[in-house]
């Protein structure tokens, strides 16, 4: 290199961030079902890391379980799906606005340890492949660097139906 060129692959590898406003533009989920607070690293068409600050005030803790609050595993999987949906929308770009990401399948879901109030869930999602409008992902959720859940899942990217928000 002669020192004048730009190394775009290094810039892409650094990724970018998406705040809560960007997440809410990208996906339709809202309280109490919006399960990511920010995306701290996103490399379009490759991977994303979402963050969920798990608060004792989460509505699901009222019944899961009183006196021993544990985040339901299916909601950890949903946080993985929401992180992947932001990755898809950021990859497709604004020209594809109006698309919705629907779960198709979940494989090999494993839950390694409970997620409790005060935990910061870091959701690492990597695109395995996509063919047409079907995308497949691998994900691992971690707390303090320790894996708490993992799954492989597929999603279909579709147009919003008329009348859908």
Curated annotation (Swiss-Prot):
Keyword Lyase: yes
Enzyme Commission no: 4.2.1.59
Disulfide bridges in this chain: none
Protein's UniProt keywords contain Lyase: yes
Record-annotated active site: 64
InterPro entries: FabA_FabZ, FabZ, HotDog_dom_sf
Subcellular location as annotated: Cytoplasm
Protein's GO biological process: fatty acid biosynthetic process; lipid A biosynthetic process
Annotated GO CC locations: cytoplasm; membrane
MF annotations from Gene Ontology: (3R)-hydroxyacyl-[acyl-carrier-protein] dehydratase activity
Record function comment: Involved in unsaturated fatty acids biosynthesis. Catalyzes the dehydration of short chain beta-hydroxyacyl-ACPs and long chain saturated and unsaturated beta-hydroxyacyl-ACPs.
Family, similarity comment: Belongs to the thioester dehydratase family. FabZ subfamily.
Protein name, as recorded: 3-hydroxyacyl-[acyl-carrier-protein] dehydratase FabZ
Source organism per UniProt: Acidiphilium cryptum (strain JF-5)
């Amino acid at each position: 290199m002669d020192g004048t060129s730009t190394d775009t692959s290094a810039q892409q590898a650094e990724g970018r961030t998406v705040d809560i406003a960007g997440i809410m533009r990208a996906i339709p989920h809202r309280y109490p079902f919006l399960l990511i607070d920010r995306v701290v690293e996103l490399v379009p068409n490759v991977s994303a890391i979402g963050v969920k600050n798990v608060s004792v005030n989460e509505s699901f803790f009222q019944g899961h379980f009183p006196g021993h609050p544990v985040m339901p595993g299916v909601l950890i999987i949903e946080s993985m799906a929401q992180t992947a949906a932001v990755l898809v929308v950021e990859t497709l770009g604004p020209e594809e606005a109006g698309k919705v990401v629907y779960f198709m399948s979940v494989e090999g879901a494993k839950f390694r340890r409970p997620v409790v109030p005060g935990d910061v869930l870091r959701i690492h999602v990597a695109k395995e492949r996509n063919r047409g409008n079907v995308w497949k992902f691998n994900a691992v959720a971690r707390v303090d660097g320790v894996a708490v859940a993992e799954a492989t899942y597929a999603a279909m990217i579709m147009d919003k139906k008329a009348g859908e928000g």
